[in-house]
């Protein structure tokens, strides 16, 4: 199967009709750039002379922004604090008119803020201002109520879990059950090693480290990765496990042994911030619009290639993905990965 620009354009056009509900950990990503010209006299550390600062939505909010840039209608729900970071995040999201933002405000809880300091484009320090304890039972109840209020109008539920406390285990399970009862597609970007929590989801999107953690073993060879993912998919009744493999692309595995592997395309890597969110967004949007699995994988892989070439938390446009199409190659489809 071959994904060319005309096929990709049709897939992206179909995304315009989708309403996708994103629930998960909200973050604000801040980037401080400057130059290092001396070492501090107070300690043997570099002194950064700041020149610019920018901020953008991160975590589940970045997934929502990527979906909106593809043309989907998005409802974003998550917990945040009653602080300046939450105000800044809401202001940034106003730049995306296709996103309806429904925050659950938790008094006294800091909104996750990740500040990256860069010198000459090279990250030298990251400071995380956040807590990771689960949100309170009352906040979980409020979040669940807000999800259920809009679930019937959505085509898909995406759970974007960064293990920052917005999605405790019991809440994940209840949201999946509610979505299945409403006959909605469910995609989960997991952080928990116990994949039984994600039972019955349509798509699970771990990276290789997360898959290995779930399997309780190290994984390096492609055939072993595929076999392990297929086994876990069958065990937990997961439709497809899409494992992101960094420089090796994306591998989709199903419980019956079906595999789709799309190798990564060589590009200069500038910044990987948010690239995983881009993959989740594009795969989800393509599947929600009715795209076949190999095409969804290939489209997401092209988007990832664009994302890593960008500075800051990546938000990829439809035009950028289409411009990347000349590098596309056939998707490998096989029931066994021998010889790959």
Spans of features found by a protein language model:
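Conserved post-catalytic alpha-helical subdomain immediately downstream of the catalytic base
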Residues: 235-239, 265-328
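A short, aliphatic-rich alpha-helical micro-motif
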Residues: 15, 151-152, 195-199
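Substrate-binding N-lobe of the ribokinase-like
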Residues: 2-11, 41-113, 141, 324-326
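Short acidic, glycine-rich surface-loop motifs adjacent to enzyme active sites
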Residues: 153-166
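Conserved phosphate-binding/catalytic loop of the ribokinase/pfkB sugar-kinase fold
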Residues: 100-109, 114-151
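Structural motif
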Residues: 21-23, 126, 155-158, 187, ...
């Amino acid at each position: 199967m071959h994904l060319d620009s005309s096929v990709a354009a049709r897939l992206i056009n179909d995304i315009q009709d989708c309403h996708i509900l994103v629930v998960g950990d909200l973050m604000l990503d801040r980037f401080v750039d400057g130059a290092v010209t001396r070492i501090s006299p107070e300690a043997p550390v570099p002194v950064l002379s700041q020149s610019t600062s920018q901020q953008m939505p991160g975590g589940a909010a970045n997934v929502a922004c990527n979906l909106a840039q593809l043309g989907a209608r998005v409802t974003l729900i998550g917990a945040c604090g009653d602080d300046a970071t939450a105000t800044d995040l809401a202001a940034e999201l106003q730049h995306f008119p296709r996103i309806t933002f429904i925050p659950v405000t938790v008094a006294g809880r800091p909104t996750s803020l990740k500040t990256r300091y860069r010198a000459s484009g090279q990250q030298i320090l990251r400071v995380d201002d956040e807590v990771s304890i689960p949100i309170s039972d009352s906040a979980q109840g409020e979040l669940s109520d807000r999800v259920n209020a809009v679930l019937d109008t959505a085509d898909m539920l995406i759970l974007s879990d960064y293990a920052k406390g917005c999605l405790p285990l019991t809440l994940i399970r209840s949201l999946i059950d509610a979505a299945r009862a409403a006959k909605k597609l469910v995609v989960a970007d997991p952080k928990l090693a116990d994949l039984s929590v994600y039972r019955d989801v349509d798509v699970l999107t771990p990276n290789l480290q997360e898959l290995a953690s779930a399997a309780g073993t190290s994984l390096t060879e492609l055939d072993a990765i595929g076999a392990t993912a297929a086994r876990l998919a069958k065990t937990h009744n997961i439709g497809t496990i899409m494992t992101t493999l960094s420089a090796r692309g994306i591998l989709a595995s199903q419980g019956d042994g079906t595999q789709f592997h799309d190798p990564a395309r060589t590009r200069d890597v500038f910044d990987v911030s948010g690239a995983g969110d881009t993959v989740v967004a594009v795969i989800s949007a393509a599947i929600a619009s009715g795209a076949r699995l190999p095409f969804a994988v290939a489209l997401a892989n092209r988007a990832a290639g664009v994302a890593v070439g960008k500075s800051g938390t990546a938000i990829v446009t439809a035009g950028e993905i289409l411009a990347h199409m000349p590098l596309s190659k056939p998707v490998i489809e096989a029931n066994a990965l021998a010889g790959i």
